[in-house]
Each structure stands twice: as structure tokens, then as C-alpha cells.
């Protein structure tokens, strides 16, 4: 290289550093890309995204290509730097060139391009793919040889090389992504997405109207009583049964009954029974996600929940499931819960023992245990493992609870002292 001028060698050296920076930045940019955004861009027809996605299908080949290119360029730059140093400073130039080149490569060919690529992966990766794609084809024999040697060495060390890493997200990972997307997703939409993810964890038992609260009509009652119940029913559908709810025979749409009553034709018990729909039964313990699909598939909106013995346990509707996703359609607190809860001036809350724990937690942002019992009475009995007497105080989690009234082996009323006053809990 004696016939090449020192200036030319320095220019070539600078070019080598730039090429090294290109390989370093390309590697970081490719590996830090958001794969899901990349797939979306590729599906939208973005050519650069398609090219990058194709390169990333074989990450081992891409990494080998980048390392081969980077190392070849750095070795060449080291040789050129040594020659330039010796020309300028003699034998001492070797040490000077080594120190200067190490600093230059470290800063300008490693740290700087990789930092920029990590901050702006798309702006680096997409343009880089224009050169990397043809380079990969050109250097395929060398890349293949390097990968073959690497795989052989890994097998010798007992490392498996045929492991396929899934690119799909787990539910917990998806939950984390939703939590961290507050700047892009509104709080309400965020809550809805998280609720959808929670549907599989919840069953119809968690949201059903308990058997004791199901309102139905005994068809053995006198006709005037039946008409009066239909006229004053606040529900869209009502269960028709014979003597006992366990002998439920059909589900009547109240609006259809009103329509028949308004017509000139005579509205009789037989007419009512013919207008009623067959009862749809839901097995106890069915996940909400499964039941929502079944409601849709069977074109049903309400079902009676039964246990393994066929006994009716409660009633569940499509609206109940949808409210778990989007929140209550009416008020922040259900009418039933509003009757069961009485806030006190001292920040405590008097609650009926039959109140649903999940509804209380949702309404007041509390954290009472929900896994083992559905009602306040059940939660306290589960904690005490005995029936308490009035005046007993129990601490469940962070809540002090006074037992106010016990009747018929059941806790009728309690007073809960939350850590934060009720207004603060609801505000959060």
C-alpha cells in the first residue's frame, strides 16, 4: 500500500468506520423493532416492512451476516489505522493508532449508532434492509458455513438448536402491554380490554342473580294475580314455574305479554304459555367467555344456572356478561346493591350480609376476597369458620368488620371500616 497516499488511507479508514456503524446500527434496529407493529405495517403493504420481516424470519442468518460484515470492516480498519499511524509517527504510531482507533470505533461505530437505532428502530431498520437483503444473498455460502459450525459446536455442548420460540403473547404479557399503553388508550377502553382478558377467570356463578332473588310467576296462581305481576314487572323476561322454581317450565318475554294483552284477542293463561320460550339452562361453573359465545350461538339472552344435580342456582343474562366488560349500563351501583349499602358519616359502611362481594369491590374500589364466597355473609363465615354472634369484630385483609345482626344462622348486617374513607375509595 506504499503507493496509496496517507490522505487516501485516512478517507478509506473513515469509510470503514461508517460501514461498521451501519452494521452495528442495523443489528440493534432490527432486533429492537416492535414485531407486532412490523407485522401490521407489512400487512398494510409497506415494502420496507415486508423486507425486514423476511430478514427476521431467520434471525440466526441475519446476525451472522451482520457479524461477518462488522468484523471484516473492523479488521480492515485496524490494519489501515496501523499503517497510517506508522507513516505519521513511526514505531510509536502503532500504539497511538490502536488507542485512537479503539476510541473512534467504540464511540462512532458502536455506542452512537446503537443508541440511535435503539431510540428510532424503524428509521434505522427499514433503510438498512435495502442493503442487508442483497448482502445476505451474496454472502449466503459464508453465512451458511458459519451457522453450520455454530450449530455443531452447540450440539457438542449439549445445547438444543431446534427450539422454536413462540412469537405470540401470553395473557399476562398482553395485560402488561395494555397497562403500559395509557398514553395511547383511554382509561375506559383500557378497563374494557382488561375485563375481556378476565372473562375466562370468571364463571357464571360470579355474576348470576342468586336463586333467592329470582322473580318468577307461579302459573298455578289465580289469573288476576298473574296479570298484576306481569303489569308491574321491571324485568324484560320472567320465569314461569309450577309451584316451585325447581319446576320452571318456560321463560316469558314481558314485552310480548304486554303486546298480547293490548290486542283485542282474549289473553289467557294458555295464550301466555304458548308465547313463552323454552328455558335455556346453563351449567354451573361455565366461564363467562364460553357462555357469551353460547348465548350468541344459541340466540339466547337469558339462562337459568343449574348445578350437577339439575337444581336451579341462579339466573344469568347476556347483559350481565357485557356489563363485566363495559361496566354497568345504568348507574355505577346496581339498584339492588344501593338498597344493601348504607354509607355512614364516620366513613364506615353498613352492608347487608346478602350483598354481592364482587359488586361491592367494583363500586367502592375495595379488595375483599372473592374466590371462596359470593356474599358478605359467605366471606365472613369463610374467615371465621363458625357462625359469629352480634357484636363480634373480625379483620379481613385491611378491613375491620363489625357483626351487627345475626339471624337464622346467617349474618344479616355488618359495618365495614375501610382503610380509606368511602368517598376517597369511590373517587379513585
From Swiss-Prot:
Residues 25-64, 113-129 are periplasmic. SMART domains: CorC_HlyC. Coiled coil: none annotated. InterPro entries: CBS_dom, CBS_dom_sf, CNNM, FAD-bd_PCMH-like_sf, FAD-bd_PCMH_sub2, Ion_transp-like_CBS, Transptr-assoc_dom. It holds the Pfam family CorC_HlyC. GO terms for cellular component: plasma membrane. Residues 208-270, 272-332 form the CBS domain. Residues 2-192 form the CNNM transmembrane domain. It is found in: Cell inner membrane. Gene3D superfamilies: 3.30.465.10, CBS-domain (3.10.580.10). Belongs to the UPF0053 family. This is UPF0053 inner membrane protein YfjD. It comes from Escherichia coli (strain K12).
Amino acid at each position: 500500500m506504499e503507493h496509496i497516499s496517507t490522505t487516501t488511507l485516512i478517507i478509506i479508514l473513515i469509510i470503514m468506520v461508517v460501514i461498521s456503524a451501519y452494521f452495528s446500527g442495523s443489528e440493534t434496529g432490527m432486533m429492537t423493532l416492535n414485531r407486532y407493529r412490523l407485522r401490521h405495517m407489512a400487512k398494510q403493504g409497506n415494502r420496507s416492512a415486508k423486507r425486514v420481516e423476511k430478514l427476521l424470519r431467520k434471525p440466526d442468518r441475519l446476525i451472522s451476516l451482520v457479524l461477518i460484515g462488522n468484523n471484516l470492516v473492523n479488521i480492515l480498519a485496524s490494519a489501515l489505522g496501523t499503517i497510517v499511524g506508522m507513516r505519521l509517527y513511526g514505531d510509536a504510531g502503532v500504539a497511538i493508532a490502536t488507542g485512537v482507533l479503539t476510541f473512534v470505533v467504540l464511540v462512532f461505530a458502536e455506542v452512537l449508532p446503537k443508541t440511535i437505532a435503539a431510540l428510532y428502530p424503524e428509521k434505522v431498520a427499514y433503510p438498512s434492509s435495502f442493503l442487508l437483503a442483497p448482502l445476505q444473498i451474496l454472502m449466503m455460502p459464508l453465512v451458511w458455513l458459519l451457522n453450520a459450525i455454530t450449530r455443531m459446536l452447540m450440539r457438542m455442548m449439549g445445547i438444543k438448536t431446534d427450539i422454536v420460540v413462540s412469537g405470540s403473547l401470553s395473557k399476562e404479557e398482553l395485560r402488561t402491554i395494555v397497562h403500559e399503553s395509557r398514553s395511547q388508550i383511554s382509561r375506559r377502553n383500557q378497563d374494557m380490554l382488561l375485563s375481556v382478558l378476565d372473562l375466562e377467570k370468571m364463571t357464571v356463578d360470579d355474576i348470576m342473580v342468586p336463586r333467592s332473588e329470582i322473580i318468577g310467576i307461579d302459573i298455578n296462581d289465580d289469573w288476576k294475580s298473574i296479570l298484576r305481576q306481569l303489569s308491574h314487572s321491571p324485568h324484560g323476561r320472567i320465569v314461569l314455574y309450577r309451584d316451585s322454581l325447581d319446576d320452571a317450565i318456560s321463560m316469558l318475554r314481558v314485552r310480548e305479554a304486554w303486546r298480547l294483552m293490548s290486542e283485542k284477542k282474549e289473553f289467557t293463561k294458555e295464550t301466555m304459555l304458548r308465547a313463552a320460550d323454552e328455558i335455556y339452562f346453563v351449567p354451573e361453573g361455565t366461564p363467562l367467555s364460553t357462555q357469551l359465545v353460547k348465548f350468541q350461538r344459541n340466540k339466547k339472552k337469558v339462562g337459568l344456572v343449574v348445578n350437577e344435580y339439575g337444581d336451579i342456582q341462579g339466573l344469568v343474562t347476556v347483559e350481565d356478561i357485557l356489563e363485566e366488560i363495559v361496566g354497568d349500563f345504568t348507574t355505577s351501583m346496581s339498584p339492588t346493591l344501593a338498597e344493601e349499602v348504607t354509607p355512614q358519616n364516620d366513613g364506615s359502611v353498613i352492608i347487608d350480609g346478602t350483598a354481592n362481594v364482587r359488586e361491592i369491590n367494583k363500586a367502592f374500589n375495595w379488595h375483599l376476597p372473592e374466590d371462596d364466597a359470593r356474599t358478605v355473609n359467605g366471606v365472613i363465615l369463610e374467615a371465621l369458620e363458625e357462625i359469629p354472634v352480634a357484636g363480634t369484630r373480625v379483620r379481613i385483609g385491611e378491613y375491620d368488620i363489625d357483626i351487627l345482626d345475626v339471624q337464622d344462622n346467617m349474618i344479616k348486617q355488618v359495618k365495614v371500616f375501610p382503610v380509606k374513607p368511602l368517598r376517597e375509595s369511590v373517587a379513585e
